[in-house]
């Protein structure tokens, strides 16, 4: 009597348009040649219900059967997928802070180039208008500061706080200038701290170094989206981010997810 072979369930990737880690996760699985079922929680009527049914609450999620992982950390994702390989080298904390400053300054420049109508209108499949995306760039850095200064767990809600409430005319650039100054001041006081310590986040325990790296590249990816927006309006970006500005950051290949 023959026994039927047991086939493992395929991987599923739960994602949403405009989500930076979602795009990076899908690109990573494709590079590794790993097939997956794509579940866009914004367009699939059952997408969010499926995500919540396995016990998750936000994207990106990589799942297989009843197991899942929040995919913000590539190292955690590799472990979940059973992939070997050396851990990717991170930029030093001082360099990450320098890059974050470049990114925050750039985001403010691009927002200044857009009109009020452009800032507050819908854009492609974006989850927020340009003014909201700009706010999120700065809020990501502010959430990092709040988590390390309190200290407390870095939650998903912290990274999104205030972004959906942004209204036409809100001075997001002024808000961003304040966050940029706060980050610089924090570094002046904390450049000597131990960045190998573990800190709690909504995607699991991570080193402070990992959280700072994610803060930097997460803001950078959304700033790349602002460049796409500016260019789409027929405007030449004021000092576009260069390859040197972004080198060494674990960014997605694409600036905009067109899936």
Segments predicted by a language model, with ranges:
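Local sequence-structure signature of Cys/Sec-based thiol-disulfide redox active-site neighborhoods
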Residues: 2-35
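Alpha-helical bundle segments that constitute or directly flank the non-heme di-iron/ferroxidase center
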Residues: 92-114, 135-146, 178, 188
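Acidic/histidine-rich alpha-helical segments that form the ligand environment
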Residues: 100-110, 164-199, 206-225
């Amino acid at each position: 009597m023959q026994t039927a072979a047991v086939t493992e369930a395929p991987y599923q990737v739960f994602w949403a348009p405009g989500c930076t880690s979602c795009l990076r996760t899908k690109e990573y699985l494709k590079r590794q040649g790993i097939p997956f079922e794509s579940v866009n929680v914004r367009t699939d009527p059952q997408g969010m219900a499926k995500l919540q049914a396995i016990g998750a609450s936000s994207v990106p999620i990589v799942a297989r059967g009843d197991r899942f992982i929040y995919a913000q950390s590539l190292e955690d994702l590799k472990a979940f997928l059973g992939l070997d390989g050396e851990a990717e080298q991170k930029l030093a904390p001082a360099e990450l802070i320098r890059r974050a400053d470049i990114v925050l300054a750039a985001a403010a420049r691009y927002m200044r180039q857009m009109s009020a109508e452009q800032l507050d209108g819908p854009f492609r499949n974006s989850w927020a208008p340009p003014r909201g995306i700009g706010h999120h760039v700065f809020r990501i850095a502010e959430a990092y500061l709040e988590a390390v200064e309190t200290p407390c767990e870095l939650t998903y809600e912290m990274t999104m706080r205030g972004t959906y409430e942004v209204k036409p005319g809100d001075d997001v650039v002024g808000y961003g200038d304040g966050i940029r100054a706060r980050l610089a001041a924090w570094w002046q006081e904390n450049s000597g701290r131990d960045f190998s310590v573990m800190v709690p986040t909504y995607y699991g325990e991570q080193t402070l170094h990992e959280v700072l790296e994610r803060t930097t590249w997460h803001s950078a990816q959304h700033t790349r989206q602002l460049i796409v927006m500016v260019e789409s309006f027929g405007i030449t970006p004021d000092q576009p981010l260069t390859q040197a500005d972004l080198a060494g950051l674990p960014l997605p290949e694409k600036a905009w997810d067109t899936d």
